[in-house]
């Protein structure tokens, strides 16, 4: 079993902690955690980005993690970036409780997300269905509110 964690923070007030657990190399990754101080009752895009570099804030995290050079999509789409985790839903207090799994990301092997960044965005991810070029790259998810480097944990 491999476990990883990321502490999210940024220039906004948004902050949180997200944990990743994968039982074996071919098992889905379980994603749990809480992200706070976002807009109430909103969907916000969340993605794994290519670089584990936050030296220039969340901007230096680079593009969505996309080793197979696919278009942006929903977590359930066959055409999606590895890093496409879709939207998180906030409650009336602006907090999102995370408890879901993903079959594409991995904590094992050459395409592991460990050492890369997790980014929470300011807008709803259109899941690649926005009908423009930016939708196919980013889902029009907007500015980067908070980010952190995904690190191996115990």
Curated annotation (Swiss-Prot):
Q: Which GO terms describe its molecular function?
A: copper ion binding; superoxide dismutase activity
The keyword Transmembrane appears for this protein: no
Transmembrane residue ranges:
none
Query: What triggers or suppresses the expression of this protein?
Result: Repressed when copper levels are low in a CUF1-dependent manner (at protein level). Induced by high temperature.
For this protein, the record's InterPro entries field holds: SOD-like_Cu/Zn_dom_sf (IPR036423), SOD_Cu/Zn_/chaperone (IPR024134), SOD_Cu/Zn_BS (IPR018152), SOD_Cu_Zn_dom (IPR001424)
Q: Does the keyword Membrane apply?
A: yes
Which protein are we looking at?
Answer: Superoxide dismutase [Cu-Zn]
Protein source organism: Cryptococcus neoformans var. grubii serotype A (strain H99 / ATCC 208821 / CBS 10515 / FGSC 9487)
Gene of this entry: SOD1
